[in-house]
């Protein structure tokens, strides 16, 4: 577990950010989505991102509960985060806690409730345009270039010799796979006969 001193000394970067307990839940979805779409990261809730003043989270239970629901209610699909509480002394000298939200890098593309896609770049959550979002889908394997329509293509663009070669490779591979299954069945039958002797 990190200490409060380590949190305060750490600069905001691609994998770390501080947020006030007063942050709007919809606004908190943005860095969660952005980190999940990038390398993952951690959010420290209860530390002002502008002044780095320790506000803490105690005494703000209603807002805290709203923020804890953000990964489920405002992220699509939901982001599976891990939360921990770090004891601290707030700026008024009272015992308090901050909330650390650990966000794993995801193999899926995540958006906020407005279907906007963000990615963490440096210490900012960058909103992706359509092309950047499509590229992220390809990078995460949720979309394949083979599925992309090529609107101006005609049958003349297809190299039938390559198609024929491909079909031969596929049919040979399928034949070999069927042959292996037949051989395995024969071996299993021989083994069963031998074990019954």
PLM feature spans:
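Conserved N-terminal catalytic/coupling substructures associated with nucleotide/phosphate chemistry
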Residues: 1-197
